[in-house]
């Protein structure tokens, strides 16, 4: 009789261990950001028109209704992240206050040669460009070479006595950081005009601010909304760049006709994306920082777009 009881007890313990193991495995699977995300979101929306969301792959993100500046989805909005190529947005916003778009800018070999190996380029040549050409080269193909040429030129405006490209770029970056602090970008610090720098930092809140400023310029909207952008140089020649934003690519599975810009950025294992989306007669800004892969940043933003499309609250 005792042996039978022992046997039953052993089976019960074994069964209990199996249940615990399966339960633990299922729990770990459910808490992954991508699993049951739709159900999680619907539960949140039942209780609030705005929610802090942990079910996205990105380290930080924010969805903003630009018609009323209301944040609808947010995650770690004040947490500092690597801006990567999104640093170029701050460079352009400041640069637009220092010079005219039609300024003719010489692309010096010294500045171009500062481009780090393996980084994104616009194949800038040693010739003259309009400033707006170079802004487009920074925004569309995310050209780091163009960023150094722009910083070199603007540094020369700020410090005409500087003799080398490196000196001019250093002056520009110092003045840029001063400007950022004065303008209220309190969590943004940049050390390289291209964003190829693992010491830099920003937040989705600061990105929201700079993008809102840039969207006031029609030329900025025109540049970032195109999958292919053709620039006409001062000598009459033309160069065409392809946008790194896959949402604009008609051949991509992520293509969305209602996405009208803005920009991508990636460095090391962090993948960033800022998107301007039109729906319900309004514009929505999505800033996403620190996804683990190229596809996950698009999947996150794609899901937010789906939320916008289906939300009765955001239609108002």
Residue ranges and their predicted role:
Residues 11-12, 34:
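Ser/Thr/Pro/Gly-rich low-complexity disordered regions
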Residues 34-205, 214-215:
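Active-site-adjacent loops and short helices of periplasmic peptidoglycan-processing enzymes
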Residues 14-27:
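Hydrophobic membrane-insertion alpha-helices, especially the h-region
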Residues 1-11:
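N-terminal Lys/Arg-rich, disordered targeting/topogenic segments
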Residues 24-38:
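Membrane-interface motif at the C-terminal end of an N-terminal transmembrane signal
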Residues 42-60, 152-316:
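Penicillin-recognizing serine hydrolase domain
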């Amino acid at each position: 009789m005792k042996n039978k009881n022992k046997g039953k007890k052993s089976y019960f313990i074994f069964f209990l261990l199996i249940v615990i193991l399966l339960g633990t495995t299922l729990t770990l699977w459910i808490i992954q950001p991508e699993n049951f995300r739709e159900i999680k979101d619907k539960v949140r929306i039942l209780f609030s028109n705005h929610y802090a969301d942990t079910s996205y792959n990105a380290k930080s993100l924010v969805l903003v209704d630009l018609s009323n500046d209301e944040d609808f989805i947010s995650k770690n909005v004040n947490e500092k992240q690597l801006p990567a190529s999104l640093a170029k947005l701050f460079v352009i916003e400041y640069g637009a206050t220092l010079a005219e778009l039609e300024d003719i800018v010489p692309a010096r070999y010294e500045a171009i040669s500062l481009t780090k190996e393996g980084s994104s380029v616009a194949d800038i040549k040693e010739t003259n460009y309009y400033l707006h050409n170079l802004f487009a080269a920074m925004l569309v193909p995310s050209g780091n070479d163009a960023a150094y040429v722009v910083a070199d030129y603007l540094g020369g405006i700020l410090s005409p006595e500087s003799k080398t490209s490196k000196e001019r770029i250093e002056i520009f970056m110092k003045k840029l950081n001063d400007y950022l602090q004065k303008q209220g970008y309190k969590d943004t610090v940049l050390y390289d005009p291209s964003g190829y720098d693992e010491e830099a930092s920003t937040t989705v809140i600061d990105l929201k601010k700079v993008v809102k400023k840039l969207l006031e310029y029609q030329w900025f909207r025109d540049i970032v909304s195109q999958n292919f952008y053709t620039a006409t140089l001062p000598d009459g020649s033309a160069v065409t760049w392809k946008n790194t934003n896959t949402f604009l690519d008609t051949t991509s599975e992520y293509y969305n006709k209602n996405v009208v810009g803005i920009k991508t950025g990636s460095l090391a294992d962090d993948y960033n994306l800022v998107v301007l989306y039109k729906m319900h007669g309004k514009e929505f800004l999505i800033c996403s920082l620190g996804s683990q892969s190229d596809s996950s940043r698009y999947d996150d933003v794609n899901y937010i777009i789906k939320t916008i499309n289906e939300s009765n609250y955001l239609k108002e």
